[in-house]
Every structure is written in C-alpha cells, then in structure tokens.
C-alpha cells in the first residue's frame, strides 16, 4: 500500500471545470492501464468514479491511482449480479440486475471521460428512478457550448465507451 497525497480527481475537476481532450486522454489512458491490470488479475472494481481516483502527489502531471476496493470482486468468486456502485456511474446491466463482468468498469470510465471533457455528468436527475431510466436507455447529449470544442473523434471515443462496453474487453480499448 502506498500513501498518496495529491487528492481526488473529483477535486481537480471541480477546480478546473473541464479538461482539454489531450489532458483527458492522458488521464483516461492511465485509468485504463490501471483497470486493465486489475482485470488481468481477475479483479472488477465496480465503483470507479472521480472520488476513487487519487493523484499520487500534488504535481500537475502526477500519476493517477485507483482506490476504494470495498465493492470490488474477483471473477473467480462467481457470477456478479449484485446491484452496487454509485448511481451516476453504474452500468445499465447492473441496474437491470443482469449478470455482469469487467465491462461495468469500462462503462464507468466512459462516464468519467465524459465528465472530464465537459465538466458535468452524462446522466443526471434528482430522482434515482429517472436517473436509472436515462442510464438504461443510454440517454445523453453532447450539449453546446460545452462540447463545441471537442473533436468528432473525441465524441466517437466517448460514444464507444458508453455504448460498446457490453461486448468489449478492456484490452481492446486500452490504446
């Protein structure tokens, strides 16, 4: 275990508002690398969110570390069906109480990437029932002016993370 002193990604998002595509891509690559390592070792986090991504130190270019494995599960412990995670970051199949696997972490990374790029979550409602319905339907927008500066390829990458997570392995998207 290591002591990390750089604070949460959440706090940096609040301070910055949003990230450039280049900076967001750098952060997401780090998260994908860490999660790929976890998945290769049979661990599914199940609660990835900016509050659980910590900066190693205060440096602007500090590496990101994954924390809070309280809801994580090993794949060899059986089929995962437990509804768990943080509401805005949880994958549709979890909400639908279907069996799930590693792809739920990819979904959460897609939500985090969306927030990094525009400063707000793709799914939001005061009512959990309405929020969950949005997530299950995949209802989100690339609202102007927040997404005006994001390239088409950036939007395509975001779409890929939020829609293709069901049938992909993390290895295919860790570029």
What spans do the regions from the language model cover?
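Conserved short submotifs of the Hanks-type protein kinase catalytic core
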Residues: 2-8, 12
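Activation segment signature within eukaryotic-like protein kinase domains
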Residues: 27-28
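Catalytic-loop of the protein kinase fold
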Residues: 39-56
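Conserved activation segment of eukaryotic-like protein kinases, specifically the C-terminal portion
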Residues: 81-93
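Conserved catalytic-loop aspartate of Hanks-type protein kinases
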Residues: 105
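Structural helix C-cap motif within protein kinase domains
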Residues: 118-121
């Amino acid at each position: 275990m290591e002591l990390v002193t750089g604070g949460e990604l959440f706090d940096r998002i609040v301070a910055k508002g949003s990230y450039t595509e280049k900076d967001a891509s750098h952060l997401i690559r780090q998260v994908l690398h860490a999660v790929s390592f976890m998945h290769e070792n049979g661990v599914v986090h199940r609660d990835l969110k900016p509050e659980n991504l910590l900066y190693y130190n205060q440096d602007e270019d500090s590496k990101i570390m994954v924390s809070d494995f309280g809801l994580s599960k090993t794949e060899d412990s059986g089929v995962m069906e437990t509804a768990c995670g943080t509401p805005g970051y949880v994958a549709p199949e979890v909400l639908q109480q279907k069996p799930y696997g590693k792809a739920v972490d990819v979904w959460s990374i897609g939500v985090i990437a969306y927030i990094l790029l525009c400063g707000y979550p793709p799914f939001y409602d005061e009512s959990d029932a309405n929020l969950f319905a949005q997530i299950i339907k995949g209802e989100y927008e690339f609202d102007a002016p927040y997404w005006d500066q994001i390239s088409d390829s950036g939007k395509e990458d975001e779409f890929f993370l939020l829609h293709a997570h069901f049938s992909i392995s993390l290895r295919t998207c860790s570029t």
